[in-house]
Amino acid sequence: MEYGKCRGIERGMGRRDFLKAATLLGATAAGAGMLAGCAPKSASEAQAQTAPAATGGLDPADVDWKYETDVVIVGSGSGGTCAAIEAAEAGADVVVFEKDKAMYGGNSALCGGYMLAAGWSTQEEITGYAGDTGEAFANQMLRWSQGLGNQDMIREACLRSGEAVDWMMDTGRTYEGASPLPPVWSCGDTEADVVPRSVYNHNAYGATEGHMATLKKRAESLSNIEIEMGCEVAHILKNAEGSVIGVQLADGSFAKARKGVVMACASVDNNLEMSKDLGLMQNVWGLTLEGAGLLAPGNPDMDSNTGDGVRMLREIGAELCMQQAVCMNDSIYVGGISDWGMSEILGKDVNIHDSSNIDAILVDKTGRRFCQDDAEWGYVMHECAQAAWKQGFTPDDPTTGYIFYVYDATGAPFFEMKGHTPDTCDTTFSADSVDGLAEFIGCDPTALASEVERWNSFCEAGLDADFGRRANMAPIATPPFYCDVVRPGPMGTFAGAKSNVEAEIIGLDGNPIPRLYGAGCIIGGNVSGAFYFGCGWSITNTVVWGREAGRNVAALEPWE
């Protein structure tokens, strides 16, 4: 693999400052180039060069191609790298353009490298659980989707998930265990759905040792993959027949793709204005609170993920597929994993990463609980966002979006471990009585006290009659009492192109756009619903659909 570098966006710019500069809806070609820090020859020249791209009338013979290759891949994350590997191993020459100057792999390099899967070859060996199937996995995920997204793609991702984990192991990745996803009772889960599918290796994660490092090493072994860092793609190019023939970079140069283009960039993660325009309510809530200083350490996301891919896809007439789901957790890890009784079910201890839910309840600004707060964390964070909007959240006043943990002295050590104390954190408050917390929350003291009393009665009975919570049924009864604001940490949205099980991107006419494929979060709306499906779902889909896109684009005959 060869590396190059062209001018691109500088890392390290503050997110809020960057967002002000990076609202790309309706941006001209010149504007896109300037925002990226690239240098077209002139504004008028850049506009003239790129006008045919948007109308689909570009003549390849009239273009001065700086790059000529078989396959262009936009984005170096897991989806893009999997596509590059498959295309290169099929004999295609590949160029990967990465917007960031320094970080290869995007969000995939920052995540824990979990994969969510069923039926991989070592599942029984490392978990003690036998007989899991992709079909059982698919049935649960389809229920969780609630009919949203592409049902065929969700099912197919689950059916291929075990193969995807095995492929990663063949590539050099190792796994040490797997955790079950906490069930979501409102989506029809039962104890039979508590299966260890979230596979991990906590001794090898991140950019240097984990999932992305494994893929990067394999890509580097292939001489027909070229990586261009700091090269922002600004436009997708189509010819007069409507086929994709390449891309234009933000510096005004052009890259020919003789076989096709794979869009594998992120979604609108850190673009607040675009999130508002697209109605991505959970992301708007998360970005607003994060922008107000309620940061959630440990929930990384690339500042350069600002919706470029969505803008480019709209330019060429791609159909969009957007879901409310956001890969988002908070600094306390609400909805954390426990073994959910699996040791008892199997009659032996199982190798499960246990980070079980905390001794706290979640309440809104009325002082009332609103969800099953021990469910899978993607579901819980979605419910927090929904509760915030229902209570009158407006982005102009972040405090209107506050959701609160309520706990007592028994639960305090866990929060202290996370750095949340009244002395060190201005969103943590303590009082000698539950009534005293109401002033900080801004609710009726009687309502809050009644809710805590009701919760305590559920703990005594061993049954949460309101929402079915089962983990950490601990009463809130030992003073001092605490409340703490939830700090949402957005890590990735799922708004982008509509696609199919061949990883082809669909146009507004309902047909695949010739020679255009997608993988990663830019096609994540197809495999998502109202809430994120849990640790490893994104990475599994990047592997499944990245490989599919790479194989299929490499199999095409060149257009010249």
Curated annotation (Swiss-Prot):
Effect ascribed to mutating C265A: Decrease in catalytic activity. Still binds a [4Fe-4S] cluster
Cofactor(s) needed: FAD; [4Fe-4S] cluster
Localization in the cell: Cell membrane
One annotated GO molecular function: metal ion binding
Effect of C327A: Decrease in catalytic activity. Still binds a [4Fe-4S] cluster
InterPro entries from the UniProt entry: FAD-dep_OxRdtase_2_FAD-bd, FAD-oxidoreductase_2, FAD/NAD-bd_sf, Succ_DH/fumarate_Rdtase_cat_sf, TAT_signal, TAT_signal_bac_arc
Gene Ontology CC annotation, any one: plasma membrane
Catalytic activity entry: digoxin + 2 Fe(II)-[cytochrome c] + 3 H(+) = dihydrodigoxin + 2 Fe(III)-[cytochrome c]; digitoxin + 2 Fe(II)-[cytochrome c] + 3 H(+) = dihydrodigitoxin + 2 Fe(III)-[cytochrome c]; digoxigenin + 2 Fe(II)-[cytochrome c] + 3 H(+) = dihydrodigoxigenin + 2 Fe(III)-[cytochrome c]; ouabain + 2 Fe(II)-[cytochrome c] + 3 H(+) = dihydroouabain + 2 Fe(III)-[cytochrome c]
Residues of the signal peptide: 1-48
GO biological process terms on file: response to toxic substance; steroid metabolic process
Keyword set includes Signal: yes
Assembly behavior: May form a membrane-associated complex with Cgr1.
Recorded family membership: Belongs to the FAD-dependent oxidoreductase 2 family.
Other observations noted: Digoxin is a toxic chemical produced by plants that, in low doses, can be used to treat heart failure and arrhythmia. cgr operon presence and abundance predicted the extent of drug inactivation by human gut microbial communities in ex vivo incubations, and is restricted to E.lenta species. Data about the gut microbes in nearly 1,900 people from three continents revealed that bacteria that can produce Cgr2 were present in the guts of more than 40% of the individuals, although often in low abundance.
Name of protein: Digoxin reductase
